[in-house]
């Protein structure tokens, strides 16, 4: 990749990964972001020039400009690049171009769990074969990075459905974790349109194998409607008895999850450090894909047992609140399905503990679109503490604020700040408590405010 490339919005997790990948593959790379952060500092340490003011950037000196979804069409650097005739690509369009440098690519998509699943697969493949690489949407704990380029053999990528940008990609293998109602403005608020876009992605001629979780209603709806039009070989996985790769013997003990997968003529036992049935589903997609790639069961078993997942997905910390030493869990979940799955995993791992759930809703549009689903999900803990909604740049929508999500939930407290949450926790926590701190906004900062 012998090009001079400018990445706009390079402080984001997705674009920063592409900038590093491009540099590793031989491109001359620079980046722009108006707000420096840990990622831009990391990029500078790798020899990538970072600009924080448009006035300091000469766009005419670049062959290509790659931009994130956070960069508006009227951004001065993007506008000038277009006037000058510089090739301008959205992040996913550049990812599609990057994939062509690799012999084989595996894309993981789905409404929930795609970052965790792609991180599990990335860890497995990099442990099974040191020539494998990945570019995903979260920090993979195995590598302490969202990107690792070890050559140009196999590449694991996370394919984003939120803006339908996965349609730009042409992988050899696709994993679909689930299909659910989220980011529905992308799909004209139509479930049929959502299914059709997933189907169009899976109909790519490049795709040889497709792994779909048939425990999920959306994946089943897709199969019912589009199976005959999909060219690739479809492998269903899940707890459902009719799965091609069937999960059973699910057990949780202390910090270990064990399960068995029956696939083709074999029965395979596995150990996993990650909690919850949803992570067993995620892991099953990965191990079955690895079996189909020709890796041995023994090597896959050993690699999976070491997988620690991705940052901010059920990260457990030992914390002290008042005089009580308790587990505090930091989690990125921000959709009713994710909240339900996470709380189920907390119950599995800590069956005899009182669960306090601290939740920060994310986006007023999500609150509004899923208003009917929130009360059931948020009522599953023993005590809920809810924060104001993290807007992510959206305007307030009347009837879709935090207090509107908790109707008829008996044990709920409204906190107006992180300090207010800490006050509540001091009053509520005892030795038999576990705290789940959850959301996609800045709520992760609350974890650091709690004493070790």
Curated annotation (Swiss-Prot):
Keywords associated with the record: ATP-binding, Cell cycle, Cell division, Cell shape, Cell wall biogenesis/degradation, Cytoplasm, Ligase, Nucleotide-binding, Peptidoglycan synthesis
Keyword Cytoplasm carried by entry: yes
SUPFAM superfamilies membership: MurCD N-terminal domain, MurD-like peptide ligases, catalytic domain, MurD-like peptide ligases, peptide-binding domain
Binding-site list for ATP: 110-116
Listed EC numbers: 6.3.2.8
Coiled coil segments of this chain: none
InterPro entries: Mur-like_cat_sf, Mur_ligase_C, Mur_ligase_C_dom_sf, Mur_ligase_cen, Mur_ligase_N, MurCDEF_pg_biosynth, UDP-N-AcMur_Ala_ligase_MurC
Reaction catalysed by this enzyme: UDP-N-acetyl-alpha-D-muramate + L-alanine + ATP = UDP-N-acetyl-alpha-D-muramoyl-L-alanine + ADP + phosphate + H(+)
Highest taxon of the lineage: Bacteria
Pathway(s): Cell wall biogenesis; peptidoglycan biosynthesis
GO molecular function: ATP binding; UDP-N-acetylmuramate-L-alanine ligase activity
One GO process term, biological-process aspect: regulation of cell shape
Gene3D superfamilies per record: Mur ligase, C-terminal domain (3.90.190.20), Mur-like, catalytic domain (3.40.1190.10), NAD(P)-binding Rossmann-like Domain (3.40.50.720)
One CC-aspect GO term: cytoplasm
Subcellular location, record wording: Cytoplasm
HAMAP family the UniProt entry points to: MurC
Family that this chain belongs to: Belongs to the MurCDEF family.
UniProt function note: Cell wall formation.
Protein name as it appears in the record: UDP-N-acetylmuramate--L-alanine ligase
Taxonomic source organism: Francisella philomiragia subsp. philomiragia (strain ATCC 25017 / CCUG 19701 / FSC 153 / O#319-036)
């Amino acid at each position: 990749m012998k090009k001079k490339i400018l990445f706009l919005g390079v402080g984001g997790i997705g674009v920063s990964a592409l900038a590093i990948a491009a540099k590793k593959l031989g491109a001359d790379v620079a980046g722009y972001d108006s707000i420096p952060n840990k990622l831009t500092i990391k990029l500078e340490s790798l020899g990538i020039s970072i600009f924080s003011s448009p006035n300091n950037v000469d766009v005419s000196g670049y062959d290509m400009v790659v931009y994130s979804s956070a960069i508006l069409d009227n951004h001065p650097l993007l506008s000038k690049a277009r006037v000058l005739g510089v090739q301008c690509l959205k992040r996913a369009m550049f990812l599609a171009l990057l994939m062509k440098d690799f012999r084989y690519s595996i894309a993981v998509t789905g409404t929930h769990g795609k970052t965790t699943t792609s991180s599990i697969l990335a860890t497995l493949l990099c442990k099974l074969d040191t020539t494998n690489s990945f570019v995903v949407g979260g920090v993979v704990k195995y590598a302490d990075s969202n990107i690792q380029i070890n050559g140009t053999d196999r590449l694991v990528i996370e394919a984003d459905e939120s803006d339908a940008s996965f349609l730009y990609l042409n992988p050899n293998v696709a994993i679909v974790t689930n299909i659910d109602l989220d980011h529905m403005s992308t799909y004209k608020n139509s479930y049929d349109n959502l299914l059709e876009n997933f189907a169009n992605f899976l109909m790519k001629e490049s795709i040889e194998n497709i792994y779909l979780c048939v425990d999920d209603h959306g994946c089943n709806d897709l199969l019912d409607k589009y199976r005959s039009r999909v060219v690739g070989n479809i492998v269903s996985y899940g707890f459902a008895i009719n799965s091609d790769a069937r999960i059973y013997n699910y057990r949780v003990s202390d910090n270990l999850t064990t399960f068995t997968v029956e696939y083709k003529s074999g029965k395979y036992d596995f150990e996993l450090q990650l909690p919850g049935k949803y992570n067993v589903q995620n892991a099953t997609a990965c191990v079955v894909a690895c079996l189909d790639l020709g890796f041995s069961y023994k090597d896959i078993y050993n690699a999976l047992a070491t997988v620690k997942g991705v940052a901010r997905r059920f990260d457990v910390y030992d914390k002290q609140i008042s005089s009580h030493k308790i587990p505090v869990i930091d989690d990125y979940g921000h959709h009713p399905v994710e909240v339900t799955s996470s709380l189920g995993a907390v119950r599995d791992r800590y069956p005899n503990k009182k669960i306090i759930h601290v939740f920060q809703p994310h986006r007023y549009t999500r609150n509004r679109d899923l208003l009917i689903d929130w009360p059931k999900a948020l009522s599953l803990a023993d005590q809920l503490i809810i924060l104001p909604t993290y807007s992510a740049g959206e305007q307030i929508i009347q009837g879709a604020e935090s207090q509107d999500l908790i109707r008829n939930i008996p044990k709920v407290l409204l906190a107006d700040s992180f300090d207010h949450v800490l006050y509540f926790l001091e009053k509520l926590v005892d030795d038999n408590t576990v705290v789940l701190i959850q959301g996609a906004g800045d709520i992760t900062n609350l974890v650091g405010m709690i004493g070790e």
